[in-house]
Amino acid sequence: MLSDADLVTFLDQGYLLIDPKTESSLPRQLFEEAADAWAARDQMQGSRFALDALADNLTTRIPALHQLLDAHPVVEALTRILGERYFRYPHNFIHQAGSDDQGFHKDSHFPWSVRGGLRSHRPNWAMLLYYPQDTTEDMGPTQIIPGSQYWNVDHEGHEVGEDLLDLRFNADKVGTNPDLSERDERLAETVHGFDAQTSSMPITVPAGTAVLTHFDLVHRGSRKNSDQERFMYKFWYLRTTEPKHTGRTISLSCKDARREPVVASMAEWLSGNRPSVPNRSKPDTEASDEAERIEQAYQRGLEGDASLTEALLSEDESTRRAAMYGLTVAGGLGAEAAMLATQSNHAGIRKSGAFLLGELAFGDTAVIATLGRLVAEDAMRDVRCTALNALGRIARYQLSQNSAFELSGIIDALTVGSDRDREPDTQGFVVATSPVRQSTAIALLNIVTAAIDAGTARDAIAPIATILQRMATSDTDRYARGTAVEGLCRLALGSEDSVLPTLIEQLSAQYAHTPPARRMDSPVDQRIARD
């Protein structure tokens, strides 16, 4: 298994280099496949197939990818960080370096710049990056800010799904500015403005290297200054089970002491034991930057500092964000504050309250009813997504403790979240997408996995199977549909024997004829980011 030291490196720095130890011919083969995919995309501009050449169906078109994804070092790392029943989300992409610079950002919660909730510090999501060629600094490598996964910038009021460190970067066309020195200066200012004590670094690696990153690590695609092609395969993964506590205390060694309280909390969540963290003297003044706010919030949460409740109810986003994370380790105090927050007239405060309820995972009837009300009634899509994610996390935890945990209230909310009439596709995106229905499908997958592992009675799972069957056969969001299919497969393998034959029959009838390619309103190449 991945060593404790490697795990701490991931929790602290937000990334881990992996040698998959595949056959020596695989990197070259995957490089050629990537080049062919981009050539095919260029020939099919204007058709959805242009997108499909690069995204979401890669393992079917390129079977050799299974050699990478099933490689023991890759599986071992994913298992240690995300648990044994991790799920490869139905989104993947082949990126190509070009002449443009991206701004620093965290990826959107869902594919194609779709926002869908709040970011958990816990390792519930991860990205696997693979470089099939030697990648040098002049080839446009991915740049990252190590340790940035726990810190963020304000985003409320901005529709774009990515959290951009420089909100004006795209509007000011910095990435295409012919004056390269001005680009570099703006990028350097962005990093310094985000945190004066940190810096960015390029991922320069030998051919065949995989990089496992925390989903929320700040990164960007940089321009290339050579004629050599640089491709990167990207895969999304998510956790579907609660951590199995080993009872072993993990020793910490963080490169930045400001991250120690949060890294210690992540290590405790994974192992069950809290590592010792050196006491740092509390500053006399209020925290002036994100890193200090997060550090102090975790310390205050562990101490049960009631002032975090007032901070959670603040309309100042950065103040509220830090309090929200600090309250995840505050137990009952956090739950009381979260319930208050869900009653707010401010959408950001309601969203923070819903998120916090999911992280704390108390299964009280009042908590379930409150989240169900947000799913059914809240006017803000982000709040509904967050409430659905929270319900999935609560059920996942509670079922791990009690196989007979009452699911009816949660199932009622997920039935609402899966309803295409109530939650139609979001307009204006590259493919049909609904963040609410994606959130619903992920919650269902978490619940199904936990219920199977717990040995929950079949009658309790049956309504979930019904929702999954409907989503798997008729949902227009490919990511919700793919996640639902995974849930049904797990049900079938978990002895829910009536599920699989019915699903096969329904899918066979639905896809007896291949649908025609759908034309796009605008060229696909304008929508594709090059990380």
Regions inferred by a protein language model and the residue ranges of each:
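Non-heme Fe(II)/2-oxoglutarate
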Residues: 212, 216-310, 320
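Short edge-strand/loop segments of extracellular domains
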Residues: 96, 145-153, 236-242
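A short secondary-structure junction signal
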Residues: 104-107, 113-115, 138-144, 153-157, ...
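Short, conserved beta-strand element in jelly-roll/cupin
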Residues: 115-137, 204-205, 237
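Double-stranded beta-helix
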Residues: 139-218
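Amphipathic alpha-helical scaffolding segments comprising HEAT/armadillo-like alpha-solenoid repeats
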Residues: 300-313, 331-343, 362-376, 397-427, ...
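Structural detector for internal amphipathic alpha-helices that build alpha-solenoid repeat scaffolds
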Residues: 279-301, 318-333, 350-363, 373, ...
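Non-heme Fe(II)-dependent double-stranded beta-helix
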Residues: 1-119
